[in-house]
Amino acid sequence: MLAGLRPPPSSGAPRRFRRPLVPVIVAAALVAVVAGIVIFRGHSGSTAASGTTPSTVSQDARRQAAVGLSGLLAQSVTDRAAVNEAAVDLRGCGPSLRQDARTLARAASSRQRLLSRLGSLPGRSLLPAAMLQDLTSAWQASAQVDTDLAGWADDMITRGCHGKSRSDAHLRASYAPESQATVGKRAFASLWNPLARRYGLPTYQRNQL
């Protein structure tokens, strides 16, 4: 039969209606909300069960970073004591000039190692940035002072001092970095000591570092 001659569809055939989509969308949204609530409660419950909160974890990590820094400071105190002893002997043209030169050279190397460890200190981002910068500046200057004083000791060994120390280029070169180190250590101590007291760690004066 030709297409144009097809009889019209029977009026008795059942009609198909599309179901409205709104209830389906609303139901899907409700399912998503319920699932989100369940997940959130589960997460909150697991956090409560473990007894930790983000702030607690942050405080613990900050304390660990402070403990790590305290260990570096203890090494610095040991170095400073050895440097002071060598400097006293040098100023008096003492009997241990060669040992003084070695002590000062070792102290300079130790400062550099401390700087490297400070730069990679775990959790350093949790400590005050200004405090770490003050300590970095102070240790850099102290390393330069130790190097200059070691050179001064070598000069006295070579030229002799005859019971009295003599100023030379190496000694004069140490003056500027020594002042810089003093400023940095004082600023560092003012920030470190309150933090150390909070965590029960040793406090320091600038002349100990």
Tell where the protein language model's regions lie, with residue ranges:
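Low-complexity, Pro/Ser/Thr/Gly/Ala-rich intrinsically disordered linkers and tails that serve as
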Residues: 1-4
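Short extracytoplasmic/periplasmic juxtamembrane "stem" segments immediately C-terminal to an N-terminal membrane anchor
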Residues: 48-70
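Generic low-polarity alpha-helical segments
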Residues: 42, 56, 123-125
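Hydrophobic single-pass membrane-targeting/anchoring helices
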Residues: 6-54
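Alpha-helical segments in soluble extracytoplasmic regions
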Residues: 64-153, 163-209
